[in-house]
């Protein structure tokens, strides 16, 4: 998938160093929002182990981690993962973040819209979900700009890196 000078593709084992750099550079702002990803990439070795596991999950179609690559620099500048997949419906949850230097430029919206189209057309998902904390205005805006509607406010639904249980807003998008 491509747009402007960006390419979206699945994360690969050869991305270990670049993936770790993306996480590490953005760690302070990701720690509570992407607790799982951050906790599995404390160093390059852990990031590499995460990628090995991710490759197996991709083959099993239980997880799809996509990266947004700046084709002019070759750098990974964003991450979109498809997780909590339920093939019985089929439905999945999306998570997304951009490198702080590329946030707020509309890149995430274009990338997410392409991934959504890909998921609906390639895997016949009937519904996609985004969960976010109510204070994450960027994620809430991104969800609504991509056609998601708020479906609920779930209390004490997510444990942050610091161990705090927080409420989440659920946004859903059904295939037309």
Regions found by a protein language model. Give the residues of each.
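A short helix-loop-beta-strand connector motif used in the catalytic cores of GNAT acetyltransferases and
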Residues: 39-40, 52-67
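Acyl-donor (CoA/ACP) binding surface of acyl/acetyltransferases
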Residues: 1-18, 22-29, 65, 69-176
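Conserved GNAT-fold acetyl-CoA-binding loop/helix
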Residues: 31-53
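Generic alpha-helical scaffold signal
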Residues: 13, 24, 41-48, 62
């Amino acid at each position: 998938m491509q747009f402007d000078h960006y390419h979206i593709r699945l994360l690969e084992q050869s991305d270990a160093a670049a993936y770790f750099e993306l996480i590490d550079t953005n760690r302070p702002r990701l720690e509570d929002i992407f607790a799982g990803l951050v906790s599995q990439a404390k160093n390059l070795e852990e990031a590499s182990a995460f990628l090995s596991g991710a490759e197996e999950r991709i083959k099993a179609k239980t997880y799809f981690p996509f990266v947004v690559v700046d084709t002019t620099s070759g750098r990974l500048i964003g991450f979109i993962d498809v997780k909590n997949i339920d093939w019985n419906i089929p439905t999945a949850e999306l998570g997304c973040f951009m490198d702080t230097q590329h946030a707020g430029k509309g890149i995430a919206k274009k990338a997410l819209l392409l991934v959504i189209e890909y998921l609906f057309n390639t895997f016949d998902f009937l519904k996609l979900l985004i969960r976010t904390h109510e204070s994450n205005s960027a994620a809430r805006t991104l969800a609504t700009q991509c056609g998601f509607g708020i479906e609920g406010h779930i209390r004490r639904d997510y444990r942050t890196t610091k161990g705090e249980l927080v409420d989440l807003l659920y946004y859903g998008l059904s295939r037309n």
